[in-house]
Amino acid sequence: MEFQLLLLCSVWALGVCAEQEVENLSGLSTNPERDIFVVRENGTTCLMAEFAVRFLIPYDVLALNGIDLITEQTSVAIPRGAQIAGKCGPSESELQISWAAQAFNFHIYFSKEKRVQGSDGKAPEAEVWKINRVQLVYDTSENTHFINAYNPGKHTASTHRLSALVTPAGRSYVCAAQQTLTLISSDHQKGVTVSIYDIQIQPFDINADFVFSEPYKCVTDQREQLEQTLPLVLGLILGLIIVITISVYHFHLKLNAAHTQQPTLPRDRSLYKNM
């Protein structure tokens, strides 16, 4: 019994140590709004996340008449000195970010699963990872952002049945475009908006320390890249058509000029004697 208890404590201690192997590298980012977070276990990177995020949080204030309530909104970003924690597993991972003396706690939960490819359901299964839950715990008694909040206290805003940033296993998700999530708050079911952009995330299967695997671009970025590339391709095709047209026209002119300069032979054979 004592051995089992010791073994259990050892496993728990190892888990705690693994959770503490985290680094906030946001100071290395060239974008002041973009954060860089790394979770490591046994000296190896197991989760990397780079993104810029902004929260739009509604809260109540008392109207001037002292009776009615007015809903205000505050915009919150993650500061450079935020504290982080994390967990890595074969099929579930987690990133926790807190700041302002624990007034804000942002949790991102990742999971890995197998999905059938194709609409007919006959294609082989492929492994993917996704964000399956996002949660923000915030305290409206924090008066830097929540000015004159009515009945201040802690609230929890969460997603329900989320399946976001679905990415093939072994690859990192990349998206410069903004991704918006709506969390439902315990504060009278208010909607908290989470806007994430300039993203690169990989919560599983990182092969090299501090290095993302092959990127998987979001549909929005692919569309924008196509929109940027398409005019260039069309311009090249149009230019090629113009060059071909001019070349054919120039060849036609030279051919006509050569034909005009040839001597005209008389059709009456009797005239050959005088030639």
Swiss-Prot record:
Domain of life of the organism encoding this protein: Eukaryota
Bilayer topology annotation: Single-pass type I membrane protein
Transmembrane region(s): 229-249
Side of membrane Extracellular, spans: 19-228
GO terms for biological process, alphabetical: establishment of protein localization to organelle
Gene3D superfamilies named in the record: 2.40.160.110
Cytoplasmic side of membrane: 250-275
Post-translational modification: Glycosylated.
Glycosylation sites: N24, N42
Transmembrane keyword on record: yes
A cellular component term, taken from the record's GO annotations: growth cone membrane
UniProt keyword RNA-binding present: no
Secretion signal, residue range per the UniProt entry: 1-18
Location within or outside the cell: Cytoplasmic vesicle membrane; Cell membrane; Cell projection, Dendrite; Cytoplasmic vesicle, Secretory vesicle, Synaptic vesicle membrane
Protein keywords: Cell membrane, Cell projection, Cytoplasmic vesicle, Endosome, Glycoprotein, Membrane, Signal, Synapse, Transmembrane, Transmembrane helix
PANTHER family attached to this UniProt entry: LYSOSOME-ASSOCIATED MEMBRANE GLYCOPROTEIN, LYSOSOME-ASSOCIATED MEMBRANE GLYCOPROTEIN 5
Function: Plays a role in short-term synaptic plasticity in a subset of GABAergic neurons in the brain.
Family affiliation: Belongs to the LAMP family.
Protein name: Lysosome-associated membrane glycoprotein 5
Natural source organism: Danio rerio (Zebrafish)
Taxonomy of the source species: Eukaryota, Metazoa, Chordata, Craniata, Vertebrata
Gene name of the record: lamp5
